[in-house]
Amino acid sequence: RSQDPALSDNNSWDAQNGDCSKGWNINNRSDCLAQTGSPKWTPGNHNTWNGCVVDRGNPTGPSALNTDTNVLATDITKNDTLFAAEQYGACPQAVMPLSYSWAGMKSLVNAMSPNGNTNQGIGLAHGWMSLVGGGPYPAPPAEDPNYKYTKVIILLTDGLNTQNRWYTDQSKIDTRQATTCANIKAAGITLYTVQVNTGGDPTSTLLQQCASDSTKFFLLTSANQMVATFQQIGTNLSNLRIAQ
């Protein structure tokens, strides 16, 4: 829940949170009412929140001059925390928890749209959490003690890391992702990485290092190779299941 202290009364809040009859991309009252043809601005509901929960940012870590801080929970008895929540109308596609619904997964993928830059580590972390549960993700189905399970993550990307929130710093992103990859593999999870390189980028050293071994990194130079690649991964996993 994100709140803007500057919007501490509902009149100011109503001017910034609502819907315009002239289009979804007109996101404040003044711009809406400036449209032609009798525009109508409808303020949002003060008792609901249409925002989204995303990964946290990467603030500067503690140091001798920047000590760690114990951030207390919001005090809901104070006036500055009682006004309506700031709304946000551009949430990305939600992550789908583990599911056997192939139709649901295909629908989710088809609804995605390419936007922004690349941060592989964010997707990798969410994939890990959806596999093991915790936080906003439900716990995975209980495992039968009579069977041995193999947990697998396939990291697919069409580009190198270029974006960390509001600034670009590839080396820092790569360093954090390398740590995530190491932790995933240390947890006994098999990690495949697939680089779709159609733009002439260098082969990703990071993705090669992230893969569980050299046979689990795939470099594709055409999107047409994706189906065959995933079929090969599926075959490898099927052979593993039969052998075990």
Set out the residue ranges of the language-model regions.
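P/S/T/G-enriched low-complexity
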Residues: R1-Q244
